[in-house]
C-alpha cells in the first residue's frame, strides 16, 4: 500500500487565471454562481482580471497538486471580503480559513482596521457559522443582494 502525498500551495491571485476562478465559482456546494449569472452582475474574466491588475482586487488562491481548489478576494479600497470560494472536496480541511486569514492580513496591512462581507442570514448555511466562529459579527445591515453584512474589527 502506498500513501499518496498531496501538495497544498497558497499564492496571490493572478489576472491570467480568472477564467478558472469563474469556473470554480459555479462549482461550490452552496451559493454557486455560474458564468452567465456572474456576467449579468458585471463580473467576467476580463473585468476580474482588470481589477486584479489595477491592484484594487487582491486575492489569495489555493492549489492542490497544481489544481485550483479555492480562493479569496478582497477590495483594497473598501476592506470588503468580496468572495471566498472552495470546491466541495476542499471543505473541512482548514483551507477556507487559511485563505480568509491571508486575505484579512493583506487588507489589514493595507490600512484597514475593519473588514466586512455579505453572508447568508440562514443559520443552516455553512457560511453562517463559519464566519461567526472566526469572530465576525453582524452589523444588523443587509446588502443589495439580501445578505447580512458582517464585520471584523482588528484589535
Describe every region a protein language model picked out:
Residues 1-16, 155:
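Conserved N-terminal entry element of GNAT/NAT acetyltransferase domains
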Residues 97, 122-140:
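Conserved active-site alpha-helix within GNAT-family acetyltransferase domains
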Residues 57, 145-151:
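Short hydrophobic/aromatic beta-strand or adjacent loop that forms the aromatic wall/cage
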Residues 63-65, 152-155:
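Active-site beta-strand termini and strand-to-loop segments that position acidic
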